[in-house]
């Protein structure tokens, strides 16, 4: 059968369009398989619109994030609490029981004129409308409400006191508050809905030196792990198995929190990055900040 000149021109065009649509369809399918969020702050500007600052937290001082209050000459102040949360929610799990894996890293500088720095920094995950609990300065790290527990009580119900329904945190605790279950030394710990850590490890905090905290959640093993280190020094490592869909709501925000009390320290964040990945049939919500 003879093919007209017009038909011979149409066939290559039709073939090209068909192949193009196949490629587009393939790309779209693979994109929908992953719901991801990524951000990275190598420095912090004075008007950092993609952070939700709470309490005494400020940005822009030498390109850093100051979580707790400092004076005009940079000296730390007592009884301060501050938090910074990333503006975009994180899809941490979905109804099909798929849970996201995530990784967070931040560099920090804790400096204190006191012989006992206090009280520490925490990376935390909470509900999207999370705010600083009342009375959460000092040992409560800006994460847990003050339950007014009688200090001379010989028994403390930790299931009812100093807890929060939707908090998962990794704490860098510079001051041991043994009356609420802390070990008798500075430590890192994993907190699940309570200031009393599920697991702790001794931490040799170095006053005035830059350290790095690296946090990983493996959704396959359901293991939350953290490593805190300084250059040319031994690292502190802690891990705990937790199923996040039993602890957290489906959508959460991630943040950094810090507090001071009677004793004080600077709680300075120099950089912060976060990546999460959830296998899903939904279109991904990806935010990137450099």
Swiss-Prot record:
A carbohydrate binds at residues 119, 139, 262-263. GO terms for molecular function: D-mannose binding; metal ion binding. Ca(2+) binds at residues 119, 173, 175, 177, 182. Glycans are attached at residue 152. The mature chain consists of residues 164-281 followed by 30-148. To form a mature chain the precursor undergoes further post-translational modification after removal of the signal sequence; cleavage after Asn at positions 148, 163, and 281 is followed by transposition and ligation (By formation of a new peptide bond) of residues 164-281 and 30-148. This maturation (circular permutation) relies on the legumain AEP1 activity and leads to an increased stability of conA after heat stress and at various pH. One of its GO terms (biological process) is defense response. Pfam families: Lectin_legB. Mn(2+) binds at residues 171, 173, 182, 187. SUPFAM superfamilies: Concanavalin A-like lectins/glucanases. The record marks 148-149, 163-164, 281-282 as: Cleavage. It comes from the Eukaryota. Homotetramer. Belongs to the leguminous lectin family. This is Concanavalin-A.
